[in-house]
Regions:
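Conserved micro-motifs of the catalytic ATP-binding
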Residues: 31-36, 68, 72-78
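Short beta-strand/loop element within the Bergerat-fold HATPase_c
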Residues: 98-110
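Short conserved segment of the HATPase_c
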Residues: 123-137
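Acidic ATP/Mg2+-coordinating residue in the GHKL
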Residues: 118
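Conserved glycine-rich
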Residues: 164-165
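Short helix-loop "hinge" at the ATP-lid/N-box region of the Bergerat-fold HATPase_c
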Residues: 90-92
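Short alpha-helical segment of the dimerization/phosphotransfer core of two-component systems
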Residues: 12-17
């Protein structure tokens, strides 16, 4: 039994390190690469991210829903989908037993605004100023157990900046968190 537990621990740590390596690589690539922002249907990106994240909610009593405006904005769709999935994953980790996650996409004059809101634990104001720092984790013991390395929000911040935007955080301890990804890549009327 001890050997089985040790093997499972080694396997889970190996997966965590692999995930960490991939996120570090993503950060390095983002800093060096030029991206072309293409007309993308906001609905397609949000539905894709929600569909990808839904299976990870199976072990918890979490409702995950998406709402969006109909239309196109300029973005790198794979990166924005990754941003949304990372924000959903963080929201899921903030919910202990049951709760709700809502992903909302709105078209703006400059591009789009993607909001991910959860009914999780929330954060203290002093934690909000550091959460996009690479390797920073609000709850180190919990995120280690859940596979977090503290790179997801740093990656999201880079993606937002590539879209001439930013991340905005609002949180109330014990009530939940809202993350707004302001993406100012531009708007378009056609595919």
């Amino acid at each position: 039994e001890e050997q089985q537990e040790a093997a499972e621990y080694i396997f889970s740590e190996g997966r965590r390190l692999e995930s960490l390596s991939l996120k570090l690589l993503d950060l390095l690539v983002l800093k060096k690469k030029d991206f072309e922002l293409r007309p993308t249907n906001l609905q397609t990106v949000i539905e894709g991210a929600v569909h990808t994240a839904l299976p990870s909610m199976a072990d918890k009593n979490i409702s995950l829903k998406g709402r969006y405006d109909d239309g196109f904005c300029l973005m790198e769709s794979d990166l924005v989908k990754s941003l949304i999935i990372n924000l959903i994953d963080n929201a899921k980790k903030a919910i202990d037993d049951s709760g709700n996650i809502l992903v909302v996409g709105r078209l703006t004059e400059e591009g789009c605004l993607i909001t991910v809101a959860d009914t999780g634990r929330g954060m203290k104001p002093e934690e909000l100023s550091r959460i996009t720092e690479a390797f920073y984790r609000v709850d180190k013991s919990r995120s280690r157990a859940q596979g977090g390395a503290g790179l997801g929000l740093a990656l999201c911040q880079e993606i937002a900046e590539l879209h001439h935007g930013q991340l905005i955080f609002e949180s109330i301890l014990g009530k939940g968190t809202v993350v707004k990804a302001v993406l100012n890549g531009g708007r378009t009327k056609c595919e």
